């Protein structure tokens, strides 16, 4: 009887550990959604209910994130920072979430600015923006809107955006990169709502 109980308790604890591999980070979901709304031009400002809610899943460990990705796609996740798999959830590595929180608190480095842009990138996919190059461009540019929304001054907001662009230029695969002059032109002529594909 004791052995059976121990096995049962072990199974329950194992199931709980599996279920608690991540948390839904409400702050990151709220900030991303507010940033995307702020990133649209005032005359065309998208109504709040047109910016779809995203549930940001932050994993407690790198291994938990990698295991979930590998189970879903059957491919290694060692080079994956974050992803969107349809629905209303976006999936972020532990370090990505931590760096976004540092960005929100005012630490703007290449890593934290990139992490904030990566969060916005995945939430843009949730909004229906599909093309990776355009999504990255829009996310990098929206870092400025997010920094201003978080009450950082113009100089800091511009710097954070430039750091996000620098990270993309330096570290992202070619299919995610758009030349900065082309990206700036795209952002002057359009905003993310022009690039969304809403599946009915």
What are these regions (language model features)?
Residues 1-3, 7-90, 100-102, 199:
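A metal-dependent hydrolase signature that marks the N-terminal structural subdomain at the beginning
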Residues 2-10, 113, 120, 186:
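Solvent-exposed, charged interface segments at domain starts and junctions
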Residues 10, 126-127, 174:
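Short N-terminal micro-motifs specific to bacterial/archaeal maturation
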Residues 23, 104-109, 122-129:
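Second-shell loop/turn segments in exported
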Residues 25, 29, 86, 109-113, ...:
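Alpha-helix initiation and capping sites
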Residues 40-44, 57-59, 63-68, 72-75, ...:
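Metalloprotease/metallohydrolase-associated module, dominated by Zn2+-dependent proteases
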Residues 92-119:
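Short acidic, glycine/tyrosine-flanked loop/strand segments centered on an H-E-D-like triad
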Residues 113, 117-130, 136, 140:
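Active-site recognition of the HExxH zinc-binding catalytic motif
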């Amino acid at each position: 009887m004791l052995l059976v109980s121990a096995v049962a308790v072990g199974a329950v604890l194992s199931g709980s550990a599996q279920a608690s591999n991540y948390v839904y980070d409400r702050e990151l979901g709220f900030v991303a959604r507010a940033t995307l709304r702020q990133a649209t031009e005032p005359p065309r400002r998208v109504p709040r209910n047109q910016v779809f809610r995203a549930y940001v899943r932050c994993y407690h460990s790198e291994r938990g994130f990698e295991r979930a990705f590998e189970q879903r796609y059957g491919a290694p996740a060692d080079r994956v920072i974050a992803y969107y798999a349809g629905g209303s959830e976006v999936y972020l590595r532990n370090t990505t979430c931590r760096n976004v929180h540092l960005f929100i608190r005012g630490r703007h480095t290449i890593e934290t600015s990139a992490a904030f842009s990566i969060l916005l990138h995945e939430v843009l996919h949730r909004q229906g923006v599909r093309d990776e190059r355009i999504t990255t461009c829009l996310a990098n540019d929206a870092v400025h809107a997010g920094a201003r929304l978080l009450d950082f001054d113009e100089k800091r907001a511009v710097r954070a955006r430039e750091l996000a662009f620098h990270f993309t230029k330096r570290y992202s695969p070619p299919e995610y990169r758009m030349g900065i002059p082309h990206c700036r032109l795209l952002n002057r002529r359009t905003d993310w709502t022009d690039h969304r594909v809403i599946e009915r």
